Amino acid sequence: GRTCVAAGARLHLIEPIGFQINEKQVRRAGLDYWDKLDYRIYDSYRDFVEKNPGIKIYMATTKARHVYSEVSFEDDCYIMFGKESAGIPEELLVENQENTIRIPMFGEIRSLNLGNSVAIVLYEALRQHGFENLNKQGNLHRLSWDN
């Protein structure tokens, strides 16, 4: 969620997500930005597709043949990630194999942390579009860069 807020991206959650949005533990996990998060929840993958007709979906998986950085992300595309424990169902991957992408990894590592994977791929898509609408320069708290 925090990565989506920082990137100005909408988070789409497809049930079952394994937690309740209003759970005390979720809020306690540092989600003080939750009120700034633009998110939607769908009952199923079919519900998601029906409510977002004609969309281009890239599916991030360790099983893909294409590297994420070799894709030209469209401005209005969606990037799908599966559950950290199981990934995206293989039936969906086979149906969408030309749009599956992976992050290269060394050796036989199973996968990266889900949040890290989202950040890597999302920020590549944003980079390709010049980080449009994002702050590209930070400010010091006590001093000025001009000193």
For each feature predicted by the language model, list its residue ranges.
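Post-transcriptional modification and biogenesis factors for structured RNAs
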Residues: G1-N147
